[in-house]
Every structure is written in C-alpha cells, then in structure tokens.
C-alpha cells in the first residue's frame, strides 16, 4: 500500500511540475513589455523594480496568464533573460522524470549541473546576442548574464569569456542529465 501511495505522489508531483512549466512557458511566450506591472511590496522593492519599456501602457495585462503571468515573465526575463526558457525546459524534464518514476542517483550533482548550465546560458546570451531581448533593457542574458560578461570580459577578454561560458554550459549539461561522454 505504501509503494502505491508513493508512486501516486510521484506522479502527482510530476503533473504539478509540468503544469507549473506550462504556466511559466505561456507567460514567457505571451510576454508584452506594455503590460502594466505593479511595484512589489517592501522589502522586495529593493531588488526588483519593473521597467515600463513602452508608451502607452496597456489598460490591463495582455499576458495569457494574467497579471501574475506578466509579473512572472518580467521577473524571469529581467534576472535570467533567455535562461528563463531553460527553466521551463528543466521543469518539463523534471516532471517527466517524476511521471516515469525515474529517480536520480545524485540530486546535489544534478543541481550543481543545472546551476552551471543556467550560468552558461545566461552568460552566452549576454555575450553573443546582447541586444536580442524580448523586453528587459539589461539584455538577452538578464542581470545574471550581464554580471558574468562584465567580470569575464574584464579578466579574459571576449574569446576567453566565450570559452569559459561554453565550457560551463557543456559541463553543466553533462552533470545535470547525469550522463558521461565516456559511457558506451
């Protein structure tokens, strides 16, 4: 009986991850820079202030997920840029693993790999396509990518920064998906 309950819990958790990914994905796809965004409550207003990038501002949020979706999409794009889409793919993958009852052998290593992958994706977005952004002024990699590129270009120049970020991304993917190159 306990195994059946545990299996049901895993499947429901998988469905919840996939539903959350669909919500975030729909919010990102229907992101509109003209959506009116409220100011966050203190103390969150010290780390995030929504920027109205266009005039005139819409009367109501046009995001498919409403005001919550508009705020979520803006927050993710400002901090992670295109890394937010990586977050959606990750949530779908985690949900699928839960639905199939596939357990991960080393969740800490996978988390470290995901963080490396996210850092590499945000940094590469800021380095390679800096002005190709759906909305935030900071650029395609968000604040995370802009910070990485500023530090890496100062110490490694353009080519070195690209090599470091690419290596970070590839190593992170290998750690996250729990695979190795040498495995037959």
Language-model regions: role of each:
Residues 1-184:
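Alpha-helical transmembrane segments used as membrane anchors
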